[in-house]
UniProtKB/Swiss-Prot annotation:
It catalyses: D-galactose(out) + ATP + H2O = D-galactose(in) + ADP + phosphate + H(+); methyl beta-D-galactoside(out) + ATP + H2O = methyl beta-D-galactoside(in) + ADP + phosphate + H(+). It comes from the Bacteria. It is an enzyme of class 7 (translocase). One of its GO terms (cellular component) is plasma membrane. ATP binds at residues 46-53. Keywords: ATP-binding, Cell inner membrane, Cell membrane, Membrane, Nucleotide-binding, Repeat, Sugar transport, Translocase, Transport. The keyword Repeat applies. This is Galactose/methyl galactoside import ATP-binding protein MglA. GO terms for molecular function: ATP binding; ATP hydrolysis activity. SUPFAM superfamilies: P-loop containing nucleoside triphosphate hydrolases. It is a peripheral membrane protein.
Amino acid sequence: MADITTEQQGEWLLEMKNISKSFPGVKALDNVNLNVRPHSIHALMGENGAGKSTLLKCLFGIYSKDAGSIIFQGQEVNFKNSKEALEQGVSMVHQELNLVLQRTVMDNMWLGRYPRKGMFVDHKKMYQDTKTIFDELDIDIDPRDKGATLSVSQMQIIEIAKAFSYDAKIVIMDEPTSSLTEKEVNHLFSIIRKLKARGCGIVYISHKMEEIFQLCDEITILRDGQWIATQPVEGLSMDQIIAMMVGRSLSQHFPDRISEPGEVMLEVRNLTSLRQPSIRDISFDLHQGEILGIAGLVGARRTDIVETLFGIREKSAGTIRLHGKNIKNSSANEAISHGFALVTEERRATGIYAFLDVGFNSLISNIRSYKNKMGLLNNTRMKSDIQWVINAMRVKTPGHSAHIGSLSGGNQQKVIIGRWLLTQPEILMLDEPTRGIDVGAKFEIYQLMTELAKRGKGIIIISSEMPELLGITDRILVMSNGQMVGMVNTKETSQNEILRLASLYL
């Protein structure tokens, strides 16, 4: 299929030509191109570490490019920072939302540029201007509401409305649907299409293939810091996109696995958490070598189960038995001592120490084990274990001293999982482990889960991706509004059946 050309599509709104950027020991970008035209939604795809974030940081002046040019609306530009880019009409809606929760919605909309009447803020005009934008975008939110009262999807929409208020010509969206329900996603898509109709060029970053086919007009694919292709989405298949992203054909999305669950290792009976709203009367068994999925819609309290098992949430009732013996797991340290490990849902908030290095992040879950009787650290064993995490998990990093925040999401997740494996867990609990991660890294995590199950470990995975649960688990526990509404054998169920169960108590 022929690549999109200027002659085919008309003048570009944004042209990033032959952008190159190097860091010590790493060629992050090598002559990369990204061309976006008005009235279009342009997908930017690639595995974690392909160079997407670096390219956008060059656009916003966070990194200075080594070579290449950036042309916006026909003029060459070199933005010094994101504020200058925003003022010129280039906006980005981040995964990590930036609302001030204690302020009102309209305060957040106009922060730093309040309309004034003399020396005072003109609250009436600020309200009216916000309401006008909301009406144009069909946003049903009171401008006077506090940021803290908004859902994640509403916060996402406010960020888009803010870009709209700057009269942005280019809007970049980074994984905007990662925490949204299907209904919220559809509302977000309708707003994105309104921006497109106004002439905006949307750069859309997502690992969710179905969204790319549903929403996007063109796609640019990066791999290992290089531009691979820019093509119309229409006519492409999922397998073609994956092959361009990973450099090979992925004939299967999940590893081959023979399910051979052994004896019951974990027995949970009538588990109820103390904190409200809570889970109530949750009972299940986990077998050696089993991968157990937990499904449910947003608000089902799936995460509460693993947090209670791990001692983060206090239980008010119920029993936990490991290999036939009662355990309490009244704290995370106690849970770890019993062989539990938890990879949390919010990787950036609770999984990594973003400003510390890969080495520290590899060891932090097990740091006490490196101390001798004198309280001194065994540096030799620490270095050996750090290298094990990097090698065993195939972490792409310049070295163990690199800040983990500079790594791609997939590589950050590999470090987190690797550090828990250093604790030699019997039960590994994974909460949305592949959220925001590319297909190649997903497959590696599935392979790891399969290998651990083969060794007799018990795996619990929470996922909002139904194909993921159906593709990797043995059984699926279904939750609705804090209650367990079913336990199904994966081979004997369907997506529709799971969704039916998950909707029982809504």
